[in-house]
Amino acid sequence: MISRIKSFKNALNYDKMNCIEIILRRNDLMSTSFENKATNRGVITFTISQDKIKPALDKAFNKIKKDLNAPGFRKGHMPRPVFNQKFGEEVLYEDALNIVLPEAYEAAVTELGLDVVAQPKIDVVSMEKGKEWTLSAEVVTKPEVKLGDYKNLVVEVDASKEVSDEDVDAKIERERQNLAELIIKDGEAAQGDTVVIDFVGSVDGVEFDGGKGDNFSLGLGSGQFIPGFEDQLVGAKAGDEVEVNVTFPESYQAEDLAGKAAKFMTTIHEVKTKEVPELDDELAKDIDEDVDTLEDLKVKYRKELEAAQETAYDDAVEGAAIELAVANAEIVDLPEEMIHEEVNRSVNEFMGNMQRQGISPEMYFQLTGTTQEDLHNQYSAEADKRVKTNLVIEAIAKAEGFEATDSEIEQEINDLATEYNMPADQVRSLLSADMLKHDIAMKKAVEVITSTASVK
């Protein structure tokens, strides 16, 4: 009986053996096996004992009991034996499996010492009354990382710690533009102006959903609308009616509009232009109440920019060193599922941010003229890079034997609480100890890479 595998990676040397099966038997009579199918891929087979199944069946029955009717019994009071006789216990199996499966699967993965990196594909092998259930799970495991050089790296960075007078002036000019006011313009609209418009769109004389707007503020040159729309409003004046003719992109989200010519009857209500304040001491006070003169503001901004440049320079060195460490490493057969999951995570995070701003996925794709596939492709390259980077940094942390102390975990919790302005106890409830330990070990690995790196 094997109770633990010390080196699972060596046991799954697919180059030497076509198929290896490892069997484990636990004290609770749960049996678990892993069959290697290919590099970083295999099938777990595991059983669920009756002492786990019976409570799950009870929970499944109690979940539906309140809705059950049977002659001679009040609604919700059907006895279990009557239910089993009338419907059969098997109708509870699916719900019971959903209850017991997560814990059983995690136990199997833990027993085998596998590092699973994607959602498994679960199949039922056997589910017989009164017997243990047998299930299989097709899994993808974390690939082996063969580290190259990651210490004393020499890197090149396209960054500087220097701050010029032009940098300071540019920052002040940005703030000056932010304080600009939109005023009514008595004349023709130009690029950079804002027009307030009504518009009605049609294709072949038929209006379409989402093609109408009233009192919409459109910045000319902002790229808010599909290509060609804004350019045709340059030169228009308040009171003008402009026929805007455009063609929807072939990749437009709304398939019924993609590639079609459209006409937008547009009414110009107002033309507005920016009026920027004078560059003087009064402007400086408006920008920052802690200064009295424009010169004071320049001194303050120089210090801020120097601090920011220092941080940007350090970040550039860190990024270049990590990139080189990743390039020096070899990742054995990176599973594509890891990339797909990272892409999906990024897309879901982005769309979640959009929805918090009141923009639905349908609205986003219609406004940008893109598709779900375009968005996935946009994040694909970055996802590939991020997954490889994380794998290499994890491997370095393991090679260096980095672990987190209790005091480091507590400090990390306090730092996060301060950063996100929430109680430390709330941080503890949101992040598990394992997550914190992992992040701290990763930070130590990054520190090893960057602290020993030098700039060419």
Swiss-Prot record:
Record field: catalytic activity: [protein]-peptidylproline (omega=180) = [protein]-peptidylproline (omega=0)
Keyword Isomerase part of the UniProt annotation: yes
Claim: Hydrolase is one of the keywords in the record: no
Record's subcellular location: Cytoplasm
Record remark: domains: Consists of 3 domains; the N-terminus binds the ribosome, the middle domain has PPIase activity, while the C-terminus has intrinsic chaperone activity on its own.
PANTHER family to which the protein is assigned, alphabetical: TRIGGER FACTOR CHAPERONE AND PEPTIDYL-PROLYL CIS/TRANS ISOMERASE, TRIGGER FACTOR-LIKE PROTEIN TIG, CHLOROPLASTIC
Role noted for this protein: Involved in protein export. Acts as a chaperone by maintaining the newly synthesized protein in an open conformation. Functions as a peptidyl-prolyl cis-trans isomerase.
Protein name in UniProt: Trigger factor
